[in-house]
């Protein structure tokens, strides 16, 4: 819960992107869209463009560095989007901007997480223009940024881990800013002890003041957890702005101040994707035996 893709394994995956059809009929069909050319690479950080025709994702390049790639879903080969002539820079966790540029997380600061002696690289946010290779760093945080995504009002929502002079077990805060990096402000969780972490934040399509995200701990279960709908217009602190825990209805959300917040909690979720305000695609492990 303090690391990013730069700390993840770069071998032994047999990953590919597939298109599934026949979901309603039950006659499930599978078509391979992309298979990494680099042996053992995972394929992660999937982001669909607003036109529904292009998909951006992260995979290894030929030097086994993480790079952002894009594929046209109507046909064609994948292309590497991030092309920077620096042998030790990596890019991942990207999102499209409406003007054709993109945001991504990068190890551009060349710094590490203090409490693990720098062994996990810190990711900060960059602005990148694929048309000409222009690159600009937008955040200068001691610790990690995650999950940039464009909101309906044009601002960018993301998660920032605060560390300096704070109880850092409990300080992964949802932020928002302008796409050029100005006006970086807290959106949810500043000054709160619950939850420890909020990951995979995604705005709802119509009720644009709301977003969905996964709450998790600090140590313990990594990156997965409980699925919540948030409304910062109601409150921006602790459980007071959490309006529903999914898939439950009317279940009280009780704030707990503890390190391993979601150990032994079921179901567990990662990567929610709202289709509507009421319907979500999400990866789930429903029980310890799933």
Located regions from the model:
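Sequence signature of WD/YWTD-type beta-propeller architectures
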Residues: 1-290
């Amino acid at each position: 819960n303090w690391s990013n893709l730069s700390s993840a394994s770069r071998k032994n995956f047999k990953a590919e992107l597939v298109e599934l059809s026949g979901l309603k009929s039950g006659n499930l069909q599978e078509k391979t869209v992309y298979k990494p050319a680099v042996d053992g690479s995972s394929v992660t950080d999937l982001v669909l463009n607003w036109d529904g025709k292009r998909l951006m994702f992260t995979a290894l390049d030929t030097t086994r560095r993480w790079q952002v790639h894009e594929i046209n879903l109507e046909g064609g080969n994948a292309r590497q989007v991030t092309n920077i002539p620096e042998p030790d820079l990596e890019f991942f966790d990207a999102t499209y901007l409406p003007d054709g540029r993109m945001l991504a997380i990068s190890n551009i600061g060349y710094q590490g997480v203090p409490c693990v002696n720098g062994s996990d690289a810190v990711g900060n946010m960059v602005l990148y223009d694929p048309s000409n290779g222009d690159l600009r760093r937008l955040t200068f945080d001691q610790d990690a940024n995650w999950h940039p995504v464009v909101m309906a009002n044009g601002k960018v929502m993301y998660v920032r881990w605060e560390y300096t002079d704070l109880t850092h077990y409990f300080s992964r805060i949802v932020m928002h800013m302008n796409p050029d990096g100005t006006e970086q402000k807290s959106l949810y969780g500043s000054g709160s002890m619950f939850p420890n972490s909020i990951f995979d934040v995604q705005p709802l399509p119509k009720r644009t003041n709301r977003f969905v995200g996964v709450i998790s701990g600090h140590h313990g279960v990594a990156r997965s957890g409980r699925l919540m709908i948030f409304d910062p217009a109601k409150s921006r602190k602790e459980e007071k702005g959490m309006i529903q825990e999914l898939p439950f209805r009317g279940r009280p959300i009780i704030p707990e101040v503890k390190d391993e917040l979601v150990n032994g909690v079921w179901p567990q979720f990662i990567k929610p994707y709202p289709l509507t305000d009421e319907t979500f695609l999400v990866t789930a492990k429903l029980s310890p035996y799933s």
